Each structure stands twice: as C-alpha cells, then as structure tokens.
C-alpha cells in the first residue's frame, strides 16, 4: 500500500510517499513542489499539475492531507483555501477519497505531544524512517509526519 502525505502551503507543497507492506513501512519518495508563478490562477494550475505528476508516477492507494489551520492573515487563509480546493478536486478525481488530519493530531501521533515544535516533529520523523541526513525545508518532514499519522490509522483499521 502506498500512502501520499501532503502538507499544503501557499508557496510550497511538501509531499511524501510511504510504502507499507503489511508489517513495516518505508520511504518511497519525498519532496517539495515550489510554486514559481506569480498570478493566483497560474499558481493553482502549477500546483494541480505538480500533484498530477506525483499521482501518475506512483501507484497511490490513499492520500492524507493536513487540515487548514487558523492563521492571523485572512488573505493567507483565503489563498490556502483556494489551493486546497483545487488540490482536493484533483485527488478526488484521481483517487476518489482523502483523509484529513489537524496539526495537533499529526504532532500527537508522531511525537506523543500535540504541542511539539516543527523541529521535534522532524526529529521523530527522521528517527522513525531511519534517515540520518538533514531534511529541509520542514514542509517535507511535515508531509512525512502526515503520511506516518495516516499509516498508524491504517494499521489500526487492519487489526
């Protein structure tokens, strides 16, 4: 089973694909989609095309996305919501369903502490996946954490 974890942002999208063979999980691929265009509609197209490439390059069984969290800047929330809507539609068209996790759920699942910092989450993700090198930006480790969180739920469903 291949799980795609997504950390959506207004300028970057972190993603991670984990494979679970029923007993253990392994990292297939992780990276960052950087939005380079300036106009909002072009940014949305760039994001959807990028996720389409990822979905078509891998046999994705399930997708997990970080839920939108409250931000102090209403413009940022609106922009992120538009990205999120386009991303959601693409995933629904290709996969048929996706799962959402709040930042609190992800932090708690990976570190045991819902108030963990991004650095603490990154440390635990690298430890769980056996990665020694530094991973930057943290959008990538956030996507890994989202995929790990979903994988924990999948394992509970299988019991």
UniProtKB/Swiss-Prot annotation:
Write down the required cofactor(s): Mg(2+)
Q: Which residues bind Mg(2+) 1?
A: 7, 139
- Which keywords does this chain's UniProt record carry? Cytoplasm, DNA damage, DNA recombination, DNA repair, DNA-binding, Endonuclease, Hydrolase, Magnesium, Metal-binding, Nuclease
* Record-linked SUPFAM superfamilies: Ribonuclease H-like
Q: Tell me which InterPro entries the record gives.
A: RNaseH-like_sf (IPR012337), RNaseH_sf (IPR036397), X-over_junc_endoDNase_Mg_BS (IPR020563), X-over_junc_endoDNase_RuvC (IPR002176)
Q: Where in the cell is it found?
A: Cytoplasm
Reactions catalysed, semicolon-separated, are: Endonucleolytic cleavage at a junction such as a reciprocal single-stranded crossover between two homologous DNA duplexes (Holliday junction)
The record places the active site at 7, 66, 139
Biological-process GO terms, alphabetical: DNA recombination; DNA repair
Q: Which residues bind Mg(2+) 2?
A: 66
Q: Which HAMAP family match?
A: RuvC
Protein's job:
The RuvA-RuvB-RuvC complex processes Holliday junction (HJ) DNA during genetic recombination and DNA repair. Endonuclease that resolves HJ intermediates. Cleaves cruciform DNA by making single-stranded nicks across the HJ at symmetrical positions within the homologous arms, yielding a 5'-phosphate and a 3'-hydroxyl group; requires a central core of homology in the junction. The consensus cleavage sequence is 5'-(A/T)TT(C/G)-3'. Cleavage occurs on the 3'-side of the TT dinucleotide at the point of strand exchange.
Its assembly, as annotated, is: Homodimer which binds Holliday junction (HJ) DNA. The HJ becomes 2-fold symmetrical on binding to RuvC with unstacked arms; it has a different conformation from HJ DNA in complex with RuvA. In the full resolvosome a probable DNA-RuvA(4)-RuvB(12)-RuvC(2) complex forms which resolves the HJ.
Family, similarity comment: Belongs to the RuvC family.
Q: What is this protein's record name? A: Crossover junction endodeoxyribonuclease RuvC
Q: What species does this protein belong to?
A: Sulfurovum sp. (strain NBC37-1)
């Amino acid at each position: 089973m291949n799980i795609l974890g997504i950390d959506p942002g207004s300028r970057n999208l972190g993603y991670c694909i984990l494979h679970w063979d029923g007993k253990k999980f392994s990292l297939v691929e992780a990276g960052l989609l950087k939005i380079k265009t300036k106009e909002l509609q072009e940014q949305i197209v760039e994001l959807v095309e990028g996720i389409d490439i990822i979905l078509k390059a891998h046999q994705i069984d399930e997708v997990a996305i970080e839920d939108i969290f409250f931000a102090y800047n209403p413009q940022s929330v609106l922009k992120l919501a538009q990205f999120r809507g386009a991303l959601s539609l693409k995933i629904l068209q290709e996969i048929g369903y996706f799962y959402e996790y709040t930042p609190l759920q992800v932090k708690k699942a990976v570190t045991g502490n819902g108030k963990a910092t991004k650095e603490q989450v990154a440390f635990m993700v690298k430890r769980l996946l056996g990665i020694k090198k530094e991973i930057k930006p943290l959008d990538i480790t956030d996507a890994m954490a989202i995929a790990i969180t979903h994988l924990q739920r999948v394992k509970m469903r299988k019991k």
